[in-house]
């Protein structure tokens, strides 16, 4: 037995000698901090130690026991005056955490948290805190629990240099004893090596992970590695030395007992029988017993007849009971693949599951435990935890996930979110009211519009008798069109109410509430009881924009409140009328290329002198330069048409290069062709040479929701591909009188309301038109038609494709059959019902065109009847009708429908005519007063309706047969 012990001692000697040769650390200086210690250090004396700038390493060692799940501050250094913390170590049992707080150099407290520590479990624990370089910055902290390193923290901020209080105000506090709790040891150690300090707790450190070398050079790294590997061997040497001391003591006692017996006495036999005595037997060594602690620590020892017998090695070790070697459970792969396994002495610990997985941090002892308690990490289904935006496709992968596009029925992306994609074709995804029409706009947007005879926001619709887009009763929605109609039976889409009495002006007999009925009131919409009228025109002073000048038209070009009749600068351009070459058109530059005295801004022939501005055919082109040569029939003569051979009545030229969009290969002039490679341009009307399209929907980012960049989003833009037209507006209009000669009747009087979306004609007049200035290619035109009187029974309607006063389409409705009272130039008979006519008059406005319009049927060289309602039913007094017109001049498609309430009462069906290839819109009257055209709407639309293809197929088959 001596040989192995001697070898172990020799090995220990060599290791220690090598350590000494490498340079031993200074002797540790130990301060006992327990209040019961006779050598207890005054807390104030700790400060010079803790704030010594030459101090590199500082150690705190403590032994304690806490009840399960309890929390306590083990020790701390505080100011007795303001209770501020300098240093504190706290255990939080319920959270399995420990917290170290210390005062930083900037006067703030720094906090270090140690997780997954079971310190409050009713068992005795030893901790060792090693703090390094805290006075120099970038310090580090190591925590050892029961002789095993469990955590380390680096790059700690610099600690305090010293307190502002006097040393005698510094106070050390330890945790208050409770039943079954105790603080056995609390010491502060300065200087010395980690292994020297650890030995104070009877620890030969077995680290959970390799320590980083604290010195520099290959020798120090090699030395620390060897010391780590020999930690366990040193523990065994300690056991052997303890056993050797006990055996040596036993031998000494045995020898002493033998000497006490004295020398042996022999009786000399006779020579004849002398037998030489046998040599004395060597003393018998007593068998070794359990009281000499021969077994490995923790192994049960049993005395036996022959000495002792050791039980099996503890769980986590392997050996014969005397010598037990730690088992590396990590070799049996107890941890989840990819998770770091840490071999402990004894036992093992698995790190946390990888990112994207969830599972326990397994810790145990022994091969059996490692084999039967494998760490299980379950993939986290991030898709169930809302990793992607709602209503988008989420693909869960092992340890991760991937977000995809929006689910079917939703639109958007991972940045904007996925919103329900309203789908008009799928009833389940159609959000509209059953009494509303679902319209799919550009880029998939859906708009709900209440059907004819209904009003509301499209999601909720209520009855609307007068079809002016306001319901008869208020609806439970917040949109403007959910409010109750203030004139239930008279269409008034502007809901004007001058006296705010809740009754709209259109149906209020005293609209201004001054006690004077409208028929006698000279200011119908302005309260004026005195009815004063200085200039004796039809407008009282309260509403007259020229008090002393008779002006029944009340025209005010610049909208400054002063009528043109008394305004010396009608257009408000700063140039007096007498000097202004365009008195009704603002033009401060007064440019006049042809020198005819009429500025270019208002000159109907800017390049040809025409001072009288004669325009017989009312096409806005002066007679002096009007050639009427129009190759493509779109209403623009070839000399001014920006696409002379391509139909483009709208004359849109986005890039202002003189070439209309309809014949321009690059409308926005950004270098990307509209259709051919390297196009097509994903923003045809907005320059974007880089063609950015972040959501890959084929529409460039710059024009995603506003294709023409006119600052009106496509959903409410009446012409999403024309920046010059955004809303329906007839406030600017041209009056065209179709029978200017004679005095058979007077000219029409037009009143425009609701910001240009409602027109009222008040007089029993000659045939006339109010024509807007916006020209259209394909267009949808709708409005509500209402005759608000029981007097007379003549024509009212609307026009489209207007090119000049001799060329336009008209839809006109007569109430009763009647022969025109002027028999010259021919007898004209009007039949009741709706008529669709193409006007192409060789004479233009006059008696021929007048009688041709009145007559139901074709009139040579004047009017062709394209369709007539076969019912021969006239309009009813004070009943509202809604019309819908579709015109696609590129193919000659025309279709018009009329509704009474929600009932379709007339439908022209598909009508093909190419007489006018586009033009302007307006309204028409002939000998009928008090006509209301309400809730007017137009919309650019070049899409060919589906029924056109059906019509072509049917007619082709008919022709083929």
Curated annotation (Swiss-Prot):
Keywords: Calcium, Cell adhesion, Disulfide bond, EGF-like domain, Endoplasmic reticulum, Extracellular matrix, Glycoprotein, Growth factor, Mitogen, Repeat, Sarcoplasmic reticulum, Secreted, Signal, Tissue remodeling, Unfolded protein response. PANTHER family: THROMBOSPONDIN (PTHR10199), THROMBOSPONDIN-4 (PTHR10199:SF92). This is Thrombospondin-4. Belongs to the thrombospondin family. GO terms for cellular component: basement membrane; collagen-containing extracellular matrix; endoplasmic reticulum; extracellular exosome; extracellular region; extracellular space; sarcoplasmic reticulum. Residues 586-596 have a biased composition (Basic and acidic residues). It is found in: Endoplasmic reticulum; Sarcoplasmic reticulum; Secreted; Secreted, Extracellular space. Residues 27-192 form the Laminin G-like domain. Its main location: endoplasmic reticulum. Glycans are attached at residues 612, 941. Residues 660-671 have a biased composition (Acidic residues). Residues 731-945 form the TSP C-terminal domain. The keyword Disulfide bond applies. GO terms for molecular function: calcium ion binding; growth factor activity; heparin binding; integrin binding. It comes from Homo sapiens (Human). It comes from the Eukaryota.
